[in-house]
């Protein structure tokens, strides 16, 4: 800890995995006043939302058990970052002054307007509110009513598995492939588990229309669906673009390799909403923690007048649960490409559960107790050298103008 007379005001926007960890880690200095802005009064374990929807687990934690001493929690939503006046405008009408902002607003996942009927009839599971709506819809639905899950990624797989294990009649529409980021052997394991447990897996297949009681496939086929769950694709909030900050095509804040905005060195990004060098890391709970830590370290370095370090993160693989009694841990190279090795079955389920607990207990809570203590695997590939804001802005390619 260091002692100073002047407090540096840091506003962290978003209380997910990246933002909450960043808020805790900022306390390596005792001259930093940290305000965490989040639209909900509780922390949401996003990687457990499929359990919450299926009533096989909870997905919220009281912030009082997660935040370090002295952090102010403001339950509100940011509507604009005014870099000229260094203020964050909130939905309530309140304005927060800042010296630095950590932009950790996360990602979203709503049914796309481009698919007829999806917005009106499909339900997402990407956020707590949508998962709660899904839970209520499931409660009102007969057990044998057909449920369609759209999306063959990890969220879709976990949702389908959780529901079929509860006795639901589930169809999984996979798009081009099931678990496309996994190895061939890992994909076969998942496909076999789903088939044995009664999930009807359609691949390759795509949904071209969602109706109140059915889905229409791209090949013209119609499948009955009393409830359609949309898990395909993610987006991000438009706060950065609405604030006149440059973003990539998806809306993620463009930064250099220290996670500093290409437009303003007092705005630092973390988690799913960051696009360092126009080459963002995989949107994931795995990357969120290290990115939150690096964002906090960048702010601390700027306060101290030292050069911030660049991103250094190696991936090790990914986990997916298959109900409560099975799962798979897919191993990967440092660059996040899968190798032909996985751990399945009950051991895979145990690894997934330990991973979920680790993110909260050994990362977020440990940073609350001992700021600066978190470490993570390093050595993954990134653009060579320190990429400056100007270089990032000129080479990003897909940039949305302010």
Model segments located where?
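Glycine-rich, N-terminal phosphate-binding loop of Rossmann-like dinucleotide-binding domains
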Residues: 15, 105-106, 112, 219, ...
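FAD-site-proximal beta/loop scaffold in flavoenzymes
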Residues: 118-143, 222-290
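Conserved N-terminal Rossmann-fold NAD(P)-binding element of oxidoreductases
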Residues: 12-14, 103, 150-151
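A Rossmann-like FAD-binding core segment of flavoenzymes
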Residues: 72-81, 85-88, 96, 166-257, ...
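C-terminal auxiliary extensions adjacent to catalytic cores
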Residues: 324-402
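Beta1-alpha1 glycine-rich phosphate/pyrophosphate-binding loop at the start
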Residues: 2-72, 158-184, 402
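FAD-binding core/adjacent interface of flavoenzyme oxidoreductases
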Residues: 1-7, 71-146, 229
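A conserved FAD-binding loop/helix module that cradles the flavin
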Residues: 241, 249, 273-323
